[in-house]
């Protein structure tokens, strides 16, 4: 009997807009679309699966057996984590008794239930002795200082060399460039 598997990326907006402090956020949605298309070309073929939906971080895939669906879901979540650095929720497979609409509704319900449950701890790579700049969010901080003219001027913040140079320039206390 065929089975329908539903899976969906977690915190999709966070993934797409993670670089919002940069001047331009480019490439996240294209990267996600490319990942979804590559699943059909590689992983789905390995499991002899029929991909129904695979875009925007959402998947609906039909399998011959429930065991295939479960194994595919585990591999898909791991590949998503390795390729894009995020997590993917995979619902329990649903029997497909000839009525796709009913099975899809049930798969969607199981997916929402799975997303609402805490599924475990995701290890975040970290460097305990390194801080990112509080101003730009990109550079590695090398000092702790205050940014004048901000509401947070009373608090010290981690700052990178570039932001310190920009702050000094703005405050008309230019540093030697060379």
Predicted feature residues:
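Regulatory and interdomain segments flanking nucleotide-handling catalytic cores
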Residues: 1-178
């Amino acid at each position: 009997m065929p089975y329908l598997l539903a899976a969906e990326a977690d915190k999709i907006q966070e993934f797409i807009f993670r670089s919002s402090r940069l001047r331009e956020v480019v490439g996240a949605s294209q990267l996600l679309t490319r990942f979804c298309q590559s699943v059909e070309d590689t992983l789905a073929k390995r499991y002899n699966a029929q991909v129904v939906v695979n875009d925007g971080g959402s998947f609906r895939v039909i399998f011959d057996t429930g065991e295939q669906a479960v194994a595919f879901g585990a591999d898909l979540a791991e590949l998503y984590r390795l390729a894009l650095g995020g997590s993917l929720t995979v619902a329990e497979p649903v029997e497909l008794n000839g009525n796709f609409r009913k099975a899809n509704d049930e798969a969607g319900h199981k997916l929402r239930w799975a997303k609402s449950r805490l599924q475990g701890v995701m290890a975040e790579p970290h460097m305990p002795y390194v801080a990112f700049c509080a101003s730009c969010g990109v550079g590695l901080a090398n000092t702790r200082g205050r940014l004048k003219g901000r509401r947070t001027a009373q608090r010290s913040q981690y700052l990178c060399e570039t932001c310190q140079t920009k702050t000094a320039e703005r405050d008309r206390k230019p540093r030697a460039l060379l």
